[in-house]
Amino acid sequence: MMHQNHIFKHRPIDPTLYVADIAAIAIPAIHRHGEQEWHYATLACQLHGHVGIYSLLGVKMGLYARKQLNADLASMHVISHAGSTPPMSCFNDGLQVATGSTLGHGLIEVSHDSSPHTEAEFSLQEKHLHLCLKPSYNDIIQSEVAIAQARYGESAEYWHQIRQLAIKYWLEWDRDKIFEQVQ
């Protein structure tokens, strides 16, 4: 079994360690979602190269699945249905960070047998969990991203708006409420 924390002595939660828009949500996000989500979300953003909607959703789903299956880091097998094309595939980065089920450990695979969406299957021994983002949340993302794209095209301001949406969803969306089981 991997150690849970073998780089940091303490999780970096001090808001002064972060850029302004992330520092502004540090305390409320930690209060609302806990240090664990904060830690994995910030790691995922750093790994991913930017603050993105789908990588953060991957973190939230990965942590939710770990809780539901009572799974340690790097103990589950994950099948992602997010595909390999951005922006949806960014979900895979968040899943890997939050679950520890990485490509390097051979514990995650990406299914290409349907259109990409925020859905994943998690297995731990004989336990299995198949989750997706609730359609109402997906509709919010699609609507707000479409508005930003219509207004700004693919300009720098568009990417700024996407970052702001990601930060808003990170802070406001509770991982215990935004997913549902796939039957």
Label each region the model flagged:
Residues 2-51, 55-183:
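Non-transmembrane, aqueous-exposed alpha-helical and coiled segments at domain scale
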